[in-house]
Amino acid sequence: MEVSMPLPQIYVEKTLALIKPDVVDKEEEIQDIILGSGFTIIQRRKLHLSPEHCSNFYVEQYGKMFFPNLTAYMSSGPLVAMILARHKAISYWKELMGPSNSLVAKETHPDSLRAIYGTDELRNALHGSNDFAASEREIRFMFPAVIIEPIPIGQAAKDYINLYVAPTLLQGLTELCKEKPPDPYLWLADWLMKNNPNKPKLCHFPVTEEP
């Protein structure tokens, strides 16, 4: 009996990002920075969490002195939740946000998002998952219907590269040798962009506000 094997897949790390209530009006600016930093926004929703939902989301902070203020702040108005994807999404998003205390960020990382948009330690504009386990939990919390795929290891990634990346790259290098452009790096980059067989189609998702 012939067994049909599924095609290998490649997965990109994902993280949860929140634009907090007091900077929701800066969403478009912040998203432009996110996209310009190499992230893809996989999912996006605008919602208003109740204090109870905020308590459940920040359950690991329960019992700390700032917990009541945190839940009050996060439930004070609508926020924007996004699933961001790219290579090493969790660490890159944390780096782009900067230190959790916006006052510190303004001193040590003045170009970070929390330095630009945050106010203080509590009102720090943005949230990001701390690690992979937190990312899985937080994405499920904000996007219950999303299926989180495992990160590939070893052979699955190699199979994907051999089947889908290597042929296109080889064709590009062959064309490069024929063309002999003055700037081969720029030419190849441009060729790969134009001939990417997996080039995504731009989808415009409707913006919905939830109570």
UniProtKB/Swiss-Prot annotation:
Compartment(s): Cell projection, Cilium; Cytoplasm, Cytoskeleton, Flagellum axoneme
PROSITE patterns from the UniProt entry: NDPK_LIKE
Hydrolase in keyword set: yes
Principal location: other
EC number: 3.1.-.-
Gene Ontology biological process terms from the UniProt entry: cilium assembly; CTP biosynthetic process; epithelial cilium movement involved in extracellular fluid movement; establishment of localization in cell; flagellated sperm motility; GTP biosynthetic process; mating; negative regulation of oxidative stress-induced intrinsic apoptotic signaling pathway
CDD domains reported in the protein's UniProt record: DD_NDKH5-like, NDPk5
Listed name of the protein: Nucleoside diphosphate kinase homolog 5
Organism: Mus musculus
Taxonomic placement: Eukaryota, Metazoa, Chordata, Craniata, Vertebrata
